[in-house]
Amino acid sequence: VGLTTTQVGVLTTTQVAALNTSQMKGLTTTNVTALSAEQVAVLSSSQVGYMAAMGLNGLSGTQLSWLTTTQMAGLTSTQAGSLTTTTLAALSPEQLSVLGQAQLAALTSTQVASLAVTQLAGLSSTQLGNFSTTGLAALTEEQVDALTTTQISGFSAAQLRAMTVTAIAALDEEQTAALTSTQVGGLSTSQFASFSTTEIAALSTTQVRGLTVSEISGLSAEQVDAMTETQLSALTTTQMKGLAAADIAGMSLAQIAAFSSSQVAALSLGALTGMAQTQISALTSTQFSALTSLQVGMLNTDQVQALTTTQVAMMTTTQVKGLSSTALHEMNATQLGSLTTTQMAALTATQIAGLDSEQVNDLSAEQIAGLTATQVKSLTTTQWAALDVTQVQSFSETQVGAITTTQMRGLTETAVQALTGAQLGALSTQQVAALSTASLAGLTVTQFQSLAPTQVSALTNAQIAALSPDQLAAFTTADLSLFSKTQMGGLTAAQTEALST
């Protein structure tokens, strides 16, 4: 405007109030320093809004304190964004409290970071929500710590996410408790991971349900273990996928017990491997029965050995099929003994074949009798050798009929000698022909007498030649009539003599 500092200083309030747009914009830093309290007081909000950034920032702290809230409201967003940190520092909380959306959004990160906690305290939650994401990212730990719960609740999820991890970590328990489920769920993985164990434990079930899988998976085992039973029981089946093996391993039995059956079924295979033996054995019948066949299949040997007989007995056939052969091999006699005949019948041929001799010998007669034909065919010669007399005699005629010729050749003398007359009578001609000469030699006269003529006729020359005179004497005339000339010609003198007597 071409006025000197002296001339500006002697302007009347009427003259100051009459300054137009161009004149206000022309005020220099030197000009504005001459303005008195009376002159500043008559400036309209529009006139203040016309002042150039240079002129506005030329006002001293004392002069700035003269600006009314009405005048402050007249600042443009450009002016607000150009205020120096020194100028900002001179403004009172009341003056800042009238700034609108455009003005607050224009504040730079440097300006926001320079605000005193007392100045921030004067801003409403709505005003704080008007800060740009860049501005919010500049909030310091001290500034965030000073925010009220009302102010915190006014931030959008996106705005909170814009804050630094350090700033979020500065939130105290009372502040985090004020966050909505949307706000909590909108935090980044690293931001949520900055919560203390005390803050984690203080989250409401509503807040917990708002967490994302990424947020849960980003927690340390210590943080997860700080969650209460109520919080854990509030996790959705989707959220359960965020728990890792280390998280599960660190949980108390009370925490594990808090999970519902659907939550247990939702555990990832990796998380399930983290369960300790005490945790596995503590699973309730409802929880254990909820495990999928894939989950059961992932149980390691230590976990399988921890299963109680109650848990084993209540396994579904689908779960039983899910057990790995290695895991099944680690079951002790008590555990195996708790398997029902229905469960035994559900085992695959591979699972049956994976049992060792001691385990096979531990099976009850009822369990043996419950084996299917396919399972019987899967028994190895080593397993057959492990069977005792009671077990062998528990096989039904149908089961005996399922024995393969290869298995017949591998049957021990003890096993063959244990067969009842009914079982022997159920053998096919191919099975009879497959019996070893040593096995036949151990049959009693009574057993031989149970053989049908067709079975006798199936005996090979080598088998007949190995029979004792007493065994031959057990054959009826009808049986002997089925012998071929070759078979008869192969008889020893002792055998022939036994027949003649």
Model-derived features: where do they sit?
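General marker for long, soluble alpha-helical cores
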Residues: V1-T501
